[in-house]
């Protein structure tokens, strides 16, 4: 059993965390504003960078790792102080391997290990061959039953996976639009969007046209990103592990230990009702992937093959007598009412803003409708020996099947909730992941004592 070294990108990973140390000497330039101060700051920054790069190179040279035939990983760093860490395969809940484009060009991989029952993870920068060797030793893929989405299933996977990037891009664009910028490629891109918005403004007010065009562009960007991940996507299962891999530009692989699975989350939204299928997310330990494990049609048996014993909450609405209305409707109702008030005021003061404000109001009204759906359907049940729950978050209705045997249950009651015999129930899973169900009847919780 030979010891192996880390990839040189581990130095860059360390230097990225210390970037503030290089920027601190540049703060004096903001006050001095002269070439001498700038030269001094650059020299100090270069000196700090050189020292930290030398220390990082020494740590990289002194750091080693090895894994034996039983899947026990030992990592050591020896530079003045000896630091060792040991992790057995039986203690590992999940493992992910990420290969962004820059890493692939350098032959590197980022391996993240998620120990069972812990929030702290272990990140290793290894070569592509060593990363695959480590994954095969700790979570072997033997006699795996694999499934690759085809045709319409791959299209549904791409559409339902296009969620998070749009929100982040919208925030970034909003920040960039609020700041002055020099004419460059970014300015040219905004100029093209302005032309599209001007074309749409022939039929719509300018603000509304910009909102629609920007939303369409961001959704298309998110769709392209999700479609790139759906390329070469495969999900597989063995007797002890569950995994998936895929990606065209950014390669991603995930392996989960079946004995350490926390829950399976089936997310419903207007898009899932239109496509007739739902994305399924699986959590193990503190690993909460943003990419669905698979897209499942309710009449298909594949989910039961991957997760035997998987159960869904009942579809019938729950009894809403005494259920807390503020807990469900206030988060969306307050901004919706405020936008309605601003729309009414703008009708007489700034008519040009009326239609854009109506668009924002419509978004909050849709969130209010989703809150009503959660008010009717949110709850917790025991189905076929499995604990299942349903809760509403934004536009998504989460149908969750608990797969671990020992989630921690916390009940919180206000005086008004105690008067109607209802409680807020929080489930805490190994790794610190939490799910909250609001205003549940105490009489429907036989596994708790009230």
Please state what every model-predicted region is.
Residues 1-450:
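N-terminal basic, Ser/Thr-rich segments that initiate or prime the first beta/alpha elements at protein or domain
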């Amino acid at each position: 059993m030979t010891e192996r070294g880390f990839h040189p990108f581990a130095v860059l990973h360390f230097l990225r965390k210390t970037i503030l140390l290089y920027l601190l000497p540049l703060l004096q330039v903001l006050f001095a504003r002269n070439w001498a101060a700038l030269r001094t700051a650059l020299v100090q920054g270069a000196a700090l960078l050189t020292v930290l790069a030398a220390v990082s190179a020494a740590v990289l040279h002194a750091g080693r790792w090895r894994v034996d035939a039983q899947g026990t990983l030992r990592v050591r760093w020896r530079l003045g102080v000896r630091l060792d860490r040991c992790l057995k395969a039986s203690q590992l809940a999940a493992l992910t391997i990420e290969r962004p484009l820059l890493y692939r060009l350098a032959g590197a991989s980022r391996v993240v290990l998620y120990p069972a029952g812990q929030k702290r993870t272990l990140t290793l920068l290894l070569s592509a061959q060593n990363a695959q060797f480590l994954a095969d030793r700790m979570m072997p893929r033997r006699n795996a039953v694999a499934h690759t989405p085809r045709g319409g299933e791959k299209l549904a996977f791409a559409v339902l996976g296009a969620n998070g990037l749009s929100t982040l891009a919208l925030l970034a664009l909003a920040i960039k639009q609020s700041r002055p910028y020099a004419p460059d490629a970014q300015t040219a891109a905004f100029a093209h969007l302005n032309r599209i918005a001007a074309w749409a403004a022939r039929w719509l007010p300018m603000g509304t046209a910009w909102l629609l065009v920007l939303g369409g562009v961001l959704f298309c960007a998110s769709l392209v990103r999700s479609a790139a991940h759906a390329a070469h996507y495969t999900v597989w299962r063995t007797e002890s592990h569950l995994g998936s891999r895929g990606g065209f530009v950014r390669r991603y692989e995930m392996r989960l230990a079946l004995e350490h699975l926390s829950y399976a989350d089936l997310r419903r939204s207007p898009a899932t009702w239109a496509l007739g299928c739902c994305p399924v997310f699986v959590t193990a330990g503190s690993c909460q992937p943003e990419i669905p494990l698979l897209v499942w049609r309710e009449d298909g048996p594949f989910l039961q093959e991957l997760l035997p014993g998987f159960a869904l909450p009942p579809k019938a609405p729950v009894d809403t007598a005494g259920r807390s209305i503020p807990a469900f409707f206030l988060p969306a109702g307050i901004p919706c009412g405020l936008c309605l008030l601003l729309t009414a005021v703008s009708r007489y003061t700034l008519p040009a803003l009326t239609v854009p404000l109506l668009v924002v109001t419509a978004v909050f009204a849709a969130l209010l409708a989703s809150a009503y759906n959660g008010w009717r359907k949110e709850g917790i049940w025991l189905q076929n020996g499995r604990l299942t729950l349903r809760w509403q978050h934004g536009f998504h209705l989460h149908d969750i099947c608990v797969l671990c045997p020992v989630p921690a249950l916390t009940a919180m009651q206000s005086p008004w909730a105690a008067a109607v015999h209802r409680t807020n129930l929080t489930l805490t899973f190994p790794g610190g992941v939490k799910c909250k169900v609001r205003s549940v009847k105490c009489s429907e919780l036989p596994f708790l004592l009230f």
